[in-house]
Amino acid sequence: MSTAVRPAAGDSDLPAGRVHDVLRAHMLADGFDLVLDLEASRGVSVVDQRDGTAYLDMFGFFASSALGMNHPALADDGAFRHELATAAINKPSNSDVYTVPMARFVDTFARVLGDPALPHLFFVDGGTLAVENALKVAFDWKSRRNEAAGRDPARGTRVLHLTEAFHGRSGYTLSLTNTDPTKIARFPKFDWPRIDAPYLTDGRDVEQAEERALAQARRAFADHPQDIVCFVAEPIQGEGGDHHFRPEFFARMRELCLEHDALLIFDEVQTGCGLTGTAWAYQQLGVTPDVVAFGKKTQVCGIMAGGRVDEVHDNVFEVSSRINSTWGGNLTDMVRARRILEVIEEDRLIDRARLCGTHLLRRLDDLAAAHDAVTEPRGRGLMCAITLPTAAHRDRVVTRLREREHVLFLATGERGIRFRPPLTVTIAELDAAVDALDRTLAAVHP
């Protein structure tokens, strides 16, 4: 007989109107002014439980929502809900205790998102930790490469990266992220080599910018011989401003990495799992990395690796406990992720993201033609964005979209607005979002 103390009747029924007050009593709660209704919300319709207001979601939980809210293949499938509840009752340590649900997830992940060139998988909870472990792969690899070549194995301590990058907020990643001083100031960081990001933007000679960045990279390799373990980059810089790069730049960085015995790592935490119209953004760039960090839409975060990693026979994927965590991700997330990936596969949502993204970008081109304030419409798949004249103007537009149009958007970079809808978004829903943006731009002037 259970002796657990149960709450008195009604104590568990916290009114939605009190949510922000309860949270603010113990933590900073400065997010959206709504209370997500976990039952009433559907697809890209996010409902405020306080008053029933429905918002059109172009935010997608920071690009982590793959199918939108309460997709029927999950919410209306009794067998799946039972499976999910069973997995949620306990939290086994996946790193050492294996289960059928875990194996089904890994098998599905490899089938739907896997790359035969990157056969090694490692799962962990959080995109930052995914990047951290990608870096640990490179640190270990470079040290062993140095040792095998008769060089000092203590060398191999630096990471080459780009300006305006976001790779996380803890540990090693704090030394890479440089989008917003608020997120990194006053925290100790490593002085690692940073090169200018030669992204495509109006008025820039991008080939000249690439040459400058490549010269900086060559100088970094020369200044730190055999000490740079990898070059890490987002294929499209997300938080930094939806910055796109030419494939030629990454191809030449790959050549530099080969020349100087360093790995190439892509951080696809935001760009991965179909958002750009392919499983991974790098598949549109003609360059296969040695390690890929993933997260957000995949629900379970982690890394895929292969390529030059396997040139070291005792790499971290072969030596027990070199990289590890208690839960190795999260079994409940794995069950949900497996079903999400099955839906993505069955409904061909990655192909759909590409087609819908083409339509969205065309609408954004039209928006730029109609409004002088809108510049640089850009995107791959559903990962699209525009730029406005100032940060203040952008902020007013985003606020009015939420308050008047009931559309949720997210800022990007200093002056941009980004689209991050779920893969299930329809053309009609994208049109509704762009129409709301059109009306708002007509009403809110720079």
Label the model's feature ranges.
Residues S2-P446:
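Conserved N-terminal phosphate-binding loop of PLP-dependent enzymes in the Aspartate aminotransferase
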